């Protein structure tokens, strides 16, 4: 049984799909005006693992992750680069896909773009106007939050606490400071960049919040199981999505479970342009850090807890994966999925417990320690296959030993040096043994002496 922490109810709950034969999940995707940073990547990695777990437990899963390809940030980027929104969004969508593939993330079932769903957006706004939950003002259309009496259920914020300023737009055309825009009129830059559409309220473009409500409805219907995203989206974005969707469809629960991953900091500071500390996935990859190392670093902390990104996080991830890949040496890891090996039950149980990936990783470490102590080759092979298959379930050990270490040395020479070192140690000639270890290290080979007297590299 899968248990997940539901932000809406503020407690861990047994996950019970609306349709036991078909799980539906929507996750807020990127706004494509720049390359992805590690905060973006954390969210993608978390829901990628959840996607794999749900498929394992329930079979059919429809995972929708949108692309926000019309937004003020995209328009500003297009204007600054003397380009257009389609070129900017297409370029950065491609970059996003490349970066996410590099960290072993599977593609969602559907990846709708806001610009391709404007018709759905307009119809949803019309429905909100007709039902009295929205109003026109100075060529804008706003959602009236006072018309939705459950506003604040997700975030805990109440309508009378929403004052102008901070994250609430100051606008005299609103009935309430917390009212948010559903449709905005085109301005000069919109006309210049062709970032506008025809609508019953004139030429313009949609607000951000209505885009996700429309796309989730278009691909998953009025009600679905899981809505995910970063904790920074809880308010106002997700709160506003709930208000729109439940107001548009009477009796709808919209999303049954709300899942949020925690904040990401860099050296205990908020990641921001002003601090010049934004860490891009592409920059890490270009510096020679493997995508799988980035993935491990993002998975090491429980998804709901804050993750502080430091150099140690990366070095620890690299060291751990080196250790794991050494255990896989000799296995055909590329075809391990077709083997009869079973994924560890304890490993899966950890994931079922509110996606406790750190606990699952701890189980991998326990399996690794046990493998190193085993002398029965048949049992050792069986456990190693299970170890690799379990790791691959969360997107690790997707490569092979040879590719990971890019070994281009004479295997016989390495084994000869290891045998000479054993003889030196047996004869208590420790200086010679240490020199051989150093020689191997210079060749890029790290050796490990096991309790059973064997040496692995």
UniProtKB/Swiss-Prot annotation:
Organism: Wolbachia pipientis wMel
Pfam families referenced in this protein's UniProt entry, alphabetically: DALR_2, tRNA-synt_1e
Catalysis: reaction(s): tRNA(Cys) + L-cysteine + ATP = L-cysteinyl-tRNA(Cys) + AMP + diphosphate
Motif ('KMSKS' region): 270-274
Protein name (Swiss-Prot/TrEMBL): Cysteine--tRNA ligase
EC number: 6.1.1.16
Cofactor comment: Binds 1 zinc ion per subunit.
Motif ('HIGH' region): 30-40
Domain of life from the UniProt record: Bacteria
A single GO BP: cysteinyl-tRNA aminoacylation
Keyword S-adenosyl-L-methionine listed: no
SUPFAM superfamilies: Anticodon-binding domain of a subclass of class I aminoacyl-tRNA synthetases (SSF47323), Nucleotidylyl transferase (SSF52374)
Keyword Zinc tagged: yes
Compartment list: Cytoplasm
Family to which the UniProt record says this protein belongs: Belongs to the class-I aminoacyl-tRNA synthetase family.
Residues bound to Zn(2+): 28, 212, 237, 241
Lineage: Bacteria, Pseudomonadati, Pseudomonadota, Alphaproteobacteria, Rickettsiales
Binding site for ATP: 273
Names of the cofactor(s): Zn(2+)
Subunit description: Monomer.
InterPro entries named in the record: Cys-tRNA-ligase, Cys-tRNA-synt_Ia_DALR, Cys-tRNA/MSH_ligase, Rossmann-like_a/b/a_fold, tRNA-synt_1_cat_dom, tRNAsynth_Ia_anticodon-bd
GO molecular function: ATP binding; cysteine-tRNA ligase activity; zinc ion binding
Gene Ontology CC entries for this record: cytosol
Keywords from the named record: Aminoacyl-tRNA synthetase, ATP-binding, Cytoplasm, Ligase, Metal-binding, Nucleotide-binding, Protein biosynthesis, Zinc
């Amino acid at each position: 049984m899968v248990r997940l922490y539901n932000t809406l109810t503020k407690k861990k709950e047994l996950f019970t799909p609306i349709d036991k034969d078909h799980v539906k999940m929507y996750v807020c995707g990127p706004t494509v005006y720049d390359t992805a940073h590690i905060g973006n990547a954390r969210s993608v990695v978390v829901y990628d693992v959840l996607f794999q777990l749900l498929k394992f437990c329930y079979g059919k899963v429809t995972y929708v992750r949108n692309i926000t390809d019309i937004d003020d940030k995209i328009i500003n980027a297009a204007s600054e680069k003397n380009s257009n929104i389609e070129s900017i969004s297409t370029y950065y969508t491609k970059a996003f896909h490349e970066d996410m593939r590099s960290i072993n993330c599977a593609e969602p079932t559907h990846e709708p773009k806001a610009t391709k769903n404007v018709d759905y957006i307009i119809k949803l706004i019309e429905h909100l106007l007709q039902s009295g939950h929205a109003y026109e003002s100075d060529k804008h259309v706003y959602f009236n939050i006072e018309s939705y009496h459950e506003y604040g259920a997700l975030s805990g914020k109440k309508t009378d606490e929403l004052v102008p300023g901070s994250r609430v737009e100051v606008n005299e055309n609103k009935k309430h400071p917390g009212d948010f825009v559903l449709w905005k009129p085109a301005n000069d830059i919109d006309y210049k960049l062709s970032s506008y559409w025809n609508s019953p309220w004139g030429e313009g473009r949609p607000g951000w919040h209505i885009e996700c409500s429309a796309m989730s409805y278009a691909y998953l219907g009025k009600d679905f199981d899981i809505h995910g995203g970063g904790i920074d989206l809880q308010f106002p974005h997700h709160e506003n999505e709930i208000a729109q969707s439940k107001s548009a469809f009477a009796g709808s629960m919209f999303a049954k479970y709300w899942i949020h991953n925690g904040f990401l900091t860099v050296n205990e500071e908020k990641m921001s342009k002003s601090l010049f500390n934004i860490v891009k996935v592409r920059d890490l990859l270009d510096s020679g850090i493997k995508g799988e190392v980035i993935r491990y670093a993002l998975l090491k902390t429980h998804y709901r807890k804050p993750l502080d990104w430091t150099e140690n996080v990366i070095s620890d991830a690299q060291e751990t994966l080196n250790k794991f890949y050494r255990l896989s040496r000799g296995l055909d890891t590329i075809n391990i999925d077709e083997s009869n090996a079973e994924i560890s039950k304890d490993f899966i149980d950890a994931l079922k417990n509110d996606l406790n990936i750190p606990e699952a990783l701890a189980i991998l470490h326990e399996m690794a320690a046990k493998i190193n102590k085993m002398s029965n080759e048949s049992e050792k092979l069986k456990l190693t296959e299970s170890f690799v298959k379990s790791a691959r379930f969360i997107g690790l050990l997707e490569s092979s030993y040879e590719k990971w270490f890019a070994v281009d040395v004479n295997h016989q020479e390495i084994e000869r040096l290891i045998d000479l070192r054993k003889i030196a140690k047996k004869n208590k000639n420790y200086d010679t043994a240490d020199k051989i270890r150093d020689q191997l290290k210079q060749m890029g080979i790290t050796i490990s002496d096991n309790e059973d007297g064997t040496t692995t590299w």
